[in-house]
Regions:
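Short helix-coil boundary/hinge micro-motifs
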Residues: 1-270
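Conserved beta-strand positions that form and line the central face of beta-propeller blades
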Residues: 269, 279, 306
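Cysteine-rich micro-motifs
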Residues: 274-287
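Short metal-binding segments enriched for Cys and/or His
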Residues: 289-295
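Single conserved hydrophobic/aromatic residue that forms the stacking wall/gate
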Residues: 296-307
Length: 307
């Protein structure tokens, strides 16, 4: 699995600062801060950290951690890796600007099967609209005179227009949607682990529920091509970070050499050295055993001292 990602590359954009802003309708969004600087990076070089970080944000939600703690973790993730690219992840194609409308498969966030393009774009530009004109399948976008934004647009000029648009400073993603995606990934990991851990303890109906839950995990497969660099390299055409993380997570989920596990003590996701690994660190193992011993002592009746 490690070699697969070592010989692969892709590109995404992250800014050096993100903030939470509230729109007129009261909905909260994550967006790059004012005058922040973008950076192009290869998310595949961040494996397995990027996947583990995403899962552990979701595990905070699964364990019903305080909202402030979850919010802090979400912003920390986004600052480190960038926004998820929901605008290009949700439609049937990231090239939706080439069509008269935006077509949407079933998802957690939007019930409509299709939306007017302007209405769809408004979901991701609640504060400052792009200078964009859309007529039928034709669209014209005037990039701001900000040199950084112009350079960023030129870097991704061969990519779908919507992907390049999502790298602009005006772009924002609903906080609740981003947080829900992390929770969905954590739920998938938990389902996979519990299915095998409790297999002999659950009935057939429960097993089928687990199987159906896992079958719902998936997405549109990314395209790729081979580049002849210092050695043949797979270039994955991720049009959203969400899709990239989903693919990396999928490979890690089926990796038997270093299986994804949940720590028995702190409930954090980690890569185990073998299937039966239950603790993410020696410290967690010691803490768990100390806590277990203290519970045993508490439950034991106090014996009277001999006279």
């Amino acid at each position: 699995m490690k070699n697969l990602f070592e010989q692969s590359r892709s590109h995404w954009v992250r800014y050096d600062h993100y903030e939470l802003k509230t729109a007129k309708d009261g909905k909260r969004y994550i967006t790059p801060g004012k005058d922040t600087k973008p950076e192009v990076y290869n998310p595949l070089k961040e494996v397995p950290g990027i996947v583990l970080d995403a899962l552990n944000v979701g595990m905070l939600m699964m364990s019903r951690s305080p909202a402030v703690e979850v919010e802090r973790a979400v912003l920390k993730f986004v600052t480190r890796y960038g926004l998820l690219g929901l605008m290009t992840a949700l439609p049937t194609t990231p090239a939706f600007m080439d069509y008269e409308a935006v077509y949407l498969p079933k998802n957690h966030f939007l019930k409509e099967e299709s939306m007017d393009t302007d209405r769809y774009l408004a979901l991701f530009y609640p504060f400052d609209q792009l200078d964009l004109v859309k007529r039928g399948i034709e669209s014209a976008w005037k990039v701001s005179e900000d040199r950084t934004m112009v350079a960023l647009t030129m870097t991704f000029m061969d990519e779908p227009m919507a992907k390049t648009m999502s790298f602009q400073r005006q772009y924002a993603e609903p906080y609740d949607w981003v947080a829900q995606q992390f929770k969905d990934w954590a739920f998938t990991l938990t389902t996979s682990i519990l299915y095998y851990q409790d297999y002999r303890l659950i009935d057939q109906d429960t097993r089928e529920l687990y199987q159906k839950a896992m079958a719902a995990f998936g997405g549109i497969a990314p395209s790729y091509h081979i580049e002849l660099l210092d050695k043949p390299t797979i270039y994955w055409d991720f049009h959203s970070l969400l899709l990239g993380i989903q693919m990396m997570f999928s490979f890690m989920l089926v990796d038997e050499e270093h299986p994804l596990r949940l720590c028995k003590n702190c409930q954090k996701a980690f890569l185990g050295s073998h299937v039966n690994t239950t603790f993410c660190s020696p410290q967690c193992k010691n803490q768990y055993n100390v806590h277990k011993l203290s519970l045993i002592h508490i439950s034991e009746p106090t014996r009277p001292e001999p006279i």
